[in-house]
Amino acid sequence: MQIFGVDIGGSGIKGAPVDLDKGDLAQERHKVLTPHPATPDAVADGVKQVVDHFGWSGPVGVTFPGVVTDGATIRTAANVDDGWIDTDARALLGERLGGLPVTVLNDADAAGVAEMHFGAGRGRTGTVILLTFGTGIGSALFVDGVLVPNTELGHLELDGHDAEKRASSKVREDHDMTWEHWAAHRVSKYLAHVEMLFSPELFIIGGGVSRKAHKFLPHIEGIKAEIVPAQLQNNAGIVGAAMRVAEH
């Protein structure tokens, strides 16, 4: 079975039909740049461009970088325009897509669902935390395979700031940090804080940096939990968005 998944990020909006039997993209994904400002109408236009690229006419799952309740309503919008707050994203996107059924969920939760079913978390019990490092830091918390939604651990305080302002991939790029310095001094400190709070058995590191895991994972220090890269890499959000549609 195929369902369409769209992943809205701080820098790009990407999507593709997903083969839910294999947990992989059925076609090469299509990406457009996230508009700035990333207002609801502008982002909805971007989602429509991605869906229209494939001529898709069925249900669509969409991820969003913030807290999402009831599969529809946006409650926070850290890396997009504040106009999203309290927006019914399901209604907005459904209207923009000509009435197609739409389901919306947090972006990291979507990636986590995909990794737990098809990727690095498959078959794992206990406490598992997926963290996506990109424009910000997203999180998905699982206890014995069950998702605790909308944890948003990128907004924990670290050195007096939101953690994602200290340890995201964007921070590494903006400050021209080496992979080693970023891992040893920023990511390690952040993971230690999360580990103190939740004592997970496993950290899964996702987002775009998962493709470069060999450059930074060996330099993460002082963490008791196992740390592995996401297997679905940066397609996990698209796959998880499609999976959520199939659950409803």
Language-model segment annotations:
Residues 109-113:
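Short acidic loop-to-helix transition motifs that present clustered carboxylates
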Residues 107, 134, 241:
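Active-site glycine-centered loops adjacent to acidic/histidine catalytic or metal-binding residues
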